[in-house]
Amino acid sequence: MNHERSRGLYDRALSVMPGGVNSSVRATMPHPFFIERGDGGHVIDADGNRYVDWVMGYGPLLYGHDLPDPVQAAIQSHVAAGPMYGAPTEIEVEHAEFVARHVPSVESIRFVNSGTEATVSAVRLARGHTGRDKIVVMQGGYHGAQESTLVEGSPGDAHPSTKGIPESFAEHTLPIPFNDPQAAKKVFAEHGDDIAAVLVEPILANMGIVTPIDGYHETLRDLCDDHDSLLVFDEVITGFRVGGLGCAQSKFGVTPDVTTFGKIIGGGFPVGAIGGQAEIIEEFTPAGDVFQSGTFSGHPVTMAAGKASLEYAAENDVYEHVNRLGRKLREGITEICTERAPEYTVVGTDSMFKTIFTRDAPDDPDACCAGGCRQNPDCDRYDTCPKNGADVARAATDRWERVFWQEMKEQGVFLTANQFECQFTSYAHTEEDVEETLAAYREAI
């Protein structure tokens, strides 16, 4: 493939933007390819190269790059009426009502502008509600670019994971391993009276996709109940993608006190939201004393796109389609890995998928969950499948970025550029896209 124009755009970008990108995850070696437009389940770059797109904007694009007619009409109608008003609109009430009808944890909701803003606000809300400071997070989990959760280490030895965050911030954050009930019990035994909340993704979706072992979320729910702490599910990625309109919390049968949203809830436009029990959410100003505000919050175009997107999913076979393609991809990649790289682990659920380049092969190379790792203790791979962020970090992460991703790109398949970010199917993808992708996997694995 020719990437001459992308190279030139990157050189220009480097002169006016740090690293040549506006989000560090978009930086790739030797340089990013610049997208000119989307077309269904594909993107076309500045040099005219076409790719099957499984990145889907890192999750927001449930419908790919061609929005259904009702969604397009809703967006255009609100754009034509004026960009924004600095006052409430009916569409934000309607969108809130739809979410509250379908998501088990949501009685009340506050819309904001990004997933990061949602999790920042949720942490502040939990502290304000409980009068406590400490937040339990998962090692390897990700909750946006916020000071309270950009922390690594362990309880008692936590430190910021980036420059620019005071060490004192980490004193209030307690990182524990995902899928380790004993670690959760220990941190509550030692700090329970000071813990405002447990903040957890139902599925670790920024760490190669790690699903919970049986009973893990129930353990967190019980511990929070026993210590009057809040259980906060970060469903920025899984919301309205895993578990359909009920989100991942309905799939796992565990109801948090507070849920954060982003991505799909805005129909492809910038968005975030914090939902939960009314008595908790109403502690946000002006109803309560926990400050939260934003110029663009509840933006009418975003609200229209989000509401119309979810309504279309409720009335059509959207989830059946994307989940079927997701399973077909995972099954196909599993078959390829069994033949060519039995040490690799295929992960994902519903419309999410990823291959983790784990290093330890099982004794029986045919032993695997065909539709993606389900943390099944009866599976012969159970002990080698990643259970937490540290397990994924021990994989051959460098090979993904330097070799595998490059090869897939040259074969016209756009995947997330590192081992940790997950990939997504959309309503615009086809069986042919799946077959083309599996053929590329056979060459690249």
From Swiss-Prot:
It is found in: Cytoplasm. It comes from the Archaea. The modification N6-(pyridoxal phosphate)lysine is found at residue 263. The keyword Cytoplasm applies. GO terms for cellular component: cytoplasm. Its main location: cytoplasm. SUPFAM superfamilies: PLP-dependent transferases. Its EC number is 5.4.3.8. Keywords: Cytoplasm, Isomerase, Porphyrin biosynthesis, Pyridoxal phosphate. GO terms for molecular function: glutamate-1-semialdehyde 2,1-aminomutase activity; pyridoxal phosphate binding; transaminase activity. Its cofactor is pyridoxal 5'-phosphate. GO terms for biological process: protoporphyrinogen IX biosynthetic process. It catalyses: (S)-4-amino-5-oxopentanoate = 5-aminolevulinate. Pathway: Porphyrin-containing compound metabolism; protoporphyrin-IX biosynthesis; 5-aminolevulinate from L-glutamyl-tRNA(Glu): step 2/2. The keyword Isomerase applies. It is an enzyme of class 5 (isomerase). Belongs to the class-III pyridoxal-phosphate-dependent aminotransferase family. HemL subfamily. This is Glutamate-1-semialdehyde 2,1-aminomutase.
